[in-house]
Regions:
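Alpha-helix capping and helix-loop boundary segments enriched in small/acidic/polar residues
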Residues: 1-5, 39-43, 47, 168-175
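Thiamine diphosphate
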Residues: 2-15, 21
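Conserved structured core elements
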Residues: 4-8, 77, 104, 145-146, ...
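Short, solvent-exposed loop/turn segments at the edges of secondary structure
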Residues: 8, 48-51, 134
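An anion/pyrophosphate-binding glycine-rich loop and adjacent beta-alpha core
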Residues: 13, 19-126, 187-193
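Glycine- and aromatic-enriched mobile tails/lids
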Residues: 56, 61-64, 72, 82-83, ...
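FAD/FMN-dependent oxidoreductases across multiple families
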Residues: 109-153
Length: 325
C-alpha cells in the first residue's frame, strides 16, 4: 500500500510554487484491499485472482462474471467500480481458499496481513474494498523530467510524465521511476557547475508558517478530510458530491492550514476535486456517473493558477485510456 509518509508533499510544494500540475483527477484505485481495522488498508495482490481467487457478493455469487468477459481479471478500474457498487448492498469477499495449504509459502505478504487482521485465507473469506493506490496526475513534466520551472526536475509518483495515460498498468510505476530517474541524472550530470558560489542561508524559525510540533500528531480534521475525499471524490464521482467536497475542504482549511501534513493534504484535495469537477467525462480511473462516457476530443487538465484550466492536446497526442492490468 501507499506508505503513511506519502502525504502529497511533492504535489503541494509544486502547487505553492505555481508549477504546472497535470491531470490531478486521475487517481487509481486498487480493486481488492483488505477491509479491516488496519490503516491504511493493505492491498491484496492481483496475483491472487490470477491464481483463481474469486470475488463474491453477499449471496456468494461471482458478480464480476455478469460485468466483464474476463471476470475478476478485468481492468483495475472496472473491478474497483464493481466492488464499490456491490458494497452499497452488502459485503464483498475474496475467496482464495482454493490455494489451500500452500498459501503461506505462495503469498507470504498476504498471509502476514491476514494474520494481523485475525484471518486465515486458507479457510476464511477475505472482506475487501477498493483502496486509493496510485496518482497518475502530478507535476507536469516532459520526457526528460523537466517541469515548468527551469532547472527543476520531477519523477516518480509526484510527476505526471504522461506515461500512464488515465489508467496505469500494474508495475509500470517502477519502470517509470527507473527510466526517468536515470534520464534526469544523466542530464543533470552533463550540466555545467555553477560559476558562482551560493552563500549559506539561515532561515529563521519565524519564517515557517506551520506548527512543526504537530507534524507527527493525529488530527481529527485530517480524518474528516480523508472521509470527504473517499465518500465524494472516490471510485465513483458525481458533480453534486464534488461540489459538496469543495465546500468541506474549504470548511476544514482553517483547522489544517498550520498543520505540516494537513496543509499538503488540503492542497492535493483541492487539486483533485477541482479537476474532477472540471472533467465532465469518464476516462480510465476517473468515473463520473453523471458523465459516463468518454469525450471524443479529450483534453489534459493543466493547472498553473488557482482555477483548473483544460488545455487542448496538440494534434497527434491523444490521452491514453490504458489497458487491462
Amino acid at each position: 500500500p501507499t506508505p503513511p509518509e506519502a502525504t502529497a508533499a511533492g504535489l503541494a510544494l509544486a502547487r505553492r510554487a505555481a508549477l504546472a500540475v497535470r491531470d490531478p483527477e486521475s487517481v487509481q484505485f486498487h480493486p481488492p484491499a483488505l477491509d479491516s481495522a488496519l490503516d491504511p488498508r493493505p492491498l491484496l495482490t492481483e496475483a491472487l485472482r490470477g491464481e483463481g481467487a474469486h470475488l463474491l457478493d453477499g449471496a456468494g455469487r461471482r458478480f464480476m462474471l455478469d460485468v466483464h468477459d474476463d471476470g475478476e481479471l478485468a481492468p483495475r478500474d472496472v473491478v474497483a467500480r464493481q466492488i464499490w457498487k456491490q458494497r452499497r448492498h452488502g459485503p464483498v469477499h475474496l475467496d482464495a481458499r482454493m490455494i489451500g495449504p500452500a498459501f503461506p509459502e505462495r503469498f507470504p505478504t498476504v498471509w502476514a496481513i491476514a494474520q494481523r487482521a485475525g484471518l486465515d485465507p486458507r479457510v476464511d473469506l477475505l472482506p475487501v474494498s477498493p483502496a486509493q493506490h496510485f496518482h497518475m496526475g502530478g507535476v507536469a513534466t516532459d520526457a526528460e523530467g523537466r517541469t515548468s520551472l527551469p532547472g527543476l526536475r520531477a519523477c516518480g509518483e509526484a510527476a505526471s510524465t504522461g506515461l500512464h495515460g488515465a489508467n496505469r498498468l500494474a508495475s509500470n510505476s517502477l519502470l517509470e521511476g527507473l527510466v526517468f530517474g536515470a534520464r534526469i541524472a544523466a542530464e543533470l550530470g552533463d550540466l555545467a557547475p555553477p560559476t558562482t558560489a551560493v552563500a549559506d542561508t539561515t532561515v529563521p524559525a519565524t519564517a515557517l508558517d506551520v506548527d512543526l510540533d504537530r507534524r507527527h500528531t493525529a488530527d481529527p480534521a485530517i480524518d474528516e478530510l480523508r472521509a470527504v475525499m473517499w465518500d465524494r471524490v472516490g471510485v465513483v464521482r458525481h458533480a453534486d458530491g464534488l461540489r459538496a467536497a469543495r465546500e468541506e475542504i474549504d470548511r476544514l482549511a482553517p483547522a489544517l492550514a498550520s498543520h505540516p501534513t494537513g496543509r499538503n493534504l488540503l492542497a492535493a484535495a483541492g487539486l483533485v476535486t477541482g479537476a474532477a469537477l472540471g472533467r465532465e467525462e469518464s476516462r480510465g480511473s476517473h468515473h463520473r456517473v453523471d458523465h459516463a462516457t468518454a469525450d471524443p476530443a479529450p483534453d489534459h487538465t493543466v493547472i498553473s493558477h488557482p482555477d483548473p484550466v483544460a488545455v487542448p492536446l496538440p494534434t497527434g497526442a491523444p490521452v491514453q485510456q490504458g489497458s487491462p492490468a
